[in-house]
Amino acid sequence: MILYIWRHPKPMNTEGFCIGQTDVKVDKRKIKRLANKIERFVRIKQLPKIIWLSPLQRSLKVGDILSQRGFHCQVSPELSEINFGEWDGQLWAQIEKKEIDDWCNNFANFAPNNGESLQQLFNRVEEWLNARIFEEGGKIESIPILVVGHAGWINAAKIIATSQDIPKVAAEWPRSVNYLQYSRLDF
């Protein structure tokens, strides 16, 4: 299975904030720019106009434009960014240092109150990927899957695709893909 996944456009006014599943606004021009990139990519690669989206606005709004251009959009909550629970939407500076230290030192298993751990994110990503592979049913020539996703989800999928272990400490977490950039993952 081939997965082409674009990171959503950069949200507005989020500098210094912990943003996971907080629904934040994105400039309409940036949403349109990503929709244009995806449409051009699909045309050049001669792919079906089918794309998967997270229910968060920074992904979903791209799908709104693409659906007006003939794309079939499928929304899946499993594609959402990591859930930071009570941290979500707060300034990083306002989150207790001890909690952040605990998270950084037990990166795979620590979950903020009412949030999810990195292990839980990985489980969610792997379940979604396995469902897509199952749907393909072992076809020799499967149709690539297109997604507009989030940095944490993309990093988790990359780590899964390369059969690496889940990072145990924050320093092992890879650098995030740039906004509007796509990654190709092979499973």
Q: Which residues does each PLM region occupy?
A:
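Domain-level recognition of soluble alpha/beta enzyme cores
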Residues: 162-187
